[in-house]
Amino acid sequence: MIILGVDPGSRATGYGLVDPSGGDEHLVAADTIRLADTDDHPTRLKQIYDALVDVIDAHGPDEFAVEMPVYGQNPQSMLKLGRAQAAAMMAALNRDLPVAQYTPKEVKKSVTGNGNASKKQVGFMIESILSAREQTFAHDTADALAIALCHGNRDAHDDGDSYTGWASFVDANPDRVSE
């Protein structure tokens, strides 16, 4: 199974493909899509979409994971980031890939064990997990690989049970609740 992780951005979008089959994570491909230096935001969105469609067609991933935008102080920046995420998701959806979303804290915790890890710590763990110490990844690329690994970790530990809240857990597991 190949997982495509994407770290969307309005200036650069990182992507990373990993294959977690067999318990060892293998690096398939990774890079950063540098977007044209233009003020025309729709053109950048098309570049993200087109580049990711090319990556999907070239590598045939089975699943797609993307980082959710974090809340910031600048509403315009948040809108641009959300649109970049949407362009990435549309590339996956138009190729019939299932889409998963993760917060930055979820990704960091999954890869480093610390939801507040620095970019340097994330990069170190990516190189270690993927046995890629001879490679240095740009931050956007390392983040995308971390997103793919996070998704792989989630799949590996998914027991099939999903709950929408405490009430649904109690309904599904009455024997595990004591009064």
From Swiss-Prot:
| One biological process term in Gene Ontology | DNA recombination
The record's annotation in InterPro entries points to: RNaseH-like_sf, RNaseH_sf, X-over_junc_endoDNase_Mg_BS, X-over_junc_endoDNase_RuvC
Give the main location: cytoplasm
Write out the similarity annotation: Belongs to the RuvC family.
- One term of GO molecular function: crossover junction DNA endonuclease activity
Query: HAMAP family per the record?
Result: RuvC
Q: Which reaction does it catalyse?
A: Endonucleolytic cleavage at a junction such as a reciprocal single-stranded crossover between two homologous DNA duplexes (Holliday junction)
Positions of the catalytic residues: 7, 67, 140
Write out the function statement from the record: The RuvA-RuvB-RuvC complex processes Holliday junction (HJ) DNA during genetic recombination and DNA repair. Endonuclease that resolves HJ intermediates. Cleaves cruciform DNA by making single-stranded nicks across the HJ at symmetrical positions within the homologous arms, yielding a 5'-phosphate and a 3'-hydroxyl group; requires a central core of homology in the junction. The consensus cleavage sequence is 5'-(A/T)TT(C/G)-3'. Cleavage occurs on the 3'-side of the TT dinucleotide at the point of strand exchange.
Q: Which residues are Mg(2+) 2-binding?
A: 67
Organism lineage string: Bacteria, Pseudomonadati, Rhodothermota, Rhodothermia, Rhodothermales
| Keyword annotations | Cytoplasm, DNA damage, DNA recombination, DNA repair, DNA-binding, Endonuclease, Hydrolase, Magnesium, Metal-binding, Nuclease
User: Could you tell me where this protein is found in the cell?
Assistant: Cytoplasm
UniProt: Mg(2+) 1 binding residues? 7, 140
What is this protein called in UniProt? Answer: Crossover junction endodeoxyribonuclease RuvC
Cofactor annotation comment: Binds 2 Mg(2+) ion per subunit.
Q: Which GO terms describe its cellular component?
A: cytoplasm; Holliday junction resolvase complex
Q: What is its EC number?
A: 3.1.21.10
Q: Cofactor(s) for this protein?
A: Mg(2+)
SUBUNIT field: Homodimer which binds Holliday junction (HJ) DNA. The HJ becomes 2-fold symmetrical on binding to RuvC with unstacked arms; it has a different conformation from HJ DNA in complex with RuvA. In the full resolvosome a probable DNA-RuvA(4)-RuvB(12)-RuvC(2) complex forms which resolves the HJ.
